[in-house]
C-alpha cells in the first residue's frame, strides 16, 4: 500500500514538474515577435500544452529537472528561449533574416553541434518509420526534412534543430542518453510522443486515430 502511494506521489510530482515547465514556456511564447504579427498559435494554450506535454512525458525525471532550470535561468538573464528557437529555425526558412540575428545567438561548439546532428538524424529515422507505419496521422503534422522547408512551412528536422540548439550542454547530454537508450531498445520516440498526444486529444489509441484519419482522407 505504501509503495503504491509513493508511486502515486512520484507521478504527481513529475506531472507538476512538467506543468511548471510548460507554463514557463507558454509565458515566454507570449513575447515571441512574429514578423507577420501575432501568430494564432500564441492564443491556443490547449494545443500548446498537449504538444509540449506529449514530448516531456517521455523524458526521464533527471532530464525533466535539468530542462526545468533553463527557462528560469533564461528569465533571470532576460533571454527568451522561445524567441531563440524560432530564430535558429530561420537559418533554413529565412536565411537573410537569420544572418541579421546570428551574432546574438549563443555559440555552440563543434562537439556540441556534432552531438545534436547525431540526435536529429536519429529523430528523422524515427519520423520516417512512424510515417510509414501511421501515414494518416503523420499527414496531419509537419513535413519531415529540412529540404522540404519553405518560408511558411517548417519541417520536423528544422524544428528539432532549432529547439535542441537552445538547450544547455547538460540537457543535451541527458537527451542524447535517452535517444541512445531508446534506439538500443528498438523503441521509436516519435511513436511514443504521438501515442501520448492522441491520448491527450481523447482518442482510445494511436491506432484508432490512424483509422479515423485514413477514413477522412478517403472521403
How should these model regions be labeled?
Residues 56-72, 115-120, 164-167, 171-180:
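Short, structured motif recognition centered on aromatic/hydrophobic residues
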Amino acid at each position: 500500500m505504501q509503495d503504491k502511494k509513493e508511486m502515486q506521489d512520484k507521478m504527481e510530482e513529475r506531472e507538476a514538474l512538467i506543468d511548471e515547465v510548460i507554463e514557463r514556456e507558454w509565458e515566454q511564447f507570449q513575447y515571441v515577435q512574429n514578423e507577420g504579427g501575432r501568430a494564432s498559435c500564441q492564443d491556443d494554450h490547449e494545443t500548446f500544452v498537449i504538444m509540449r506535454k506529449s514530448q516531456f512525458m517521455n523524458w526521464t525525471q533527471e532530464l525533466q529537472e535539468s530542462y526545468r532550470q533553463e527557462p528560469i535561468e533564461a528569465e533571470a538573464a532576460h533571454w527568451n528561449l522561445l524567441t531563440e528557437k524560432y530564430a535558429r529555425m530561420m537559418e533554413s526558412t529565412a536565411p537573410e533574416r537569420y544572418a541579421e540575428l546570428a551574432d546574438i545567438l549563443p555559440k555552440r561548439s563543434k562537439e556540441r553541434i556534432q552531438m545534436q546532428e547525431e540526435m536529429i538524424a536519429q529523430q528523422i529515422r524515427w519520423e520516417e518509420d512512424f510515417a510509414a507505419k501511421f501515414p494518416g496521422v503523420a499527414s496531419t503534422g509537419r513535413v519531415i526534412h529540412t529540404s522540404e522547408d519553405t518560408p511558411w512551412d517548417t519541417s520536423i528536422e528544422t524544428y528539432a534543430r532549432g529547439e535542441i540548439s537552445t538547450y544547455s550542454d547538460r540537457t543535451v547530454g541527458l537527451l542524447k542518453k535517452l535517444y541512445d537508450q531508446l534506439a538500443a531498445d528498438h523503441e521509436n520516440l516519435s511513436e511514443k510522443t504521438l501515442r501520448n498526444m492522441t491520448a491527450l486529444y481523447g482518442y482510445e489509441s494511436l491506432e484508432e486515430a490512424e483509422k479515423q484519419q485514413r477514413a477522412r482522407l478517403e472521403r
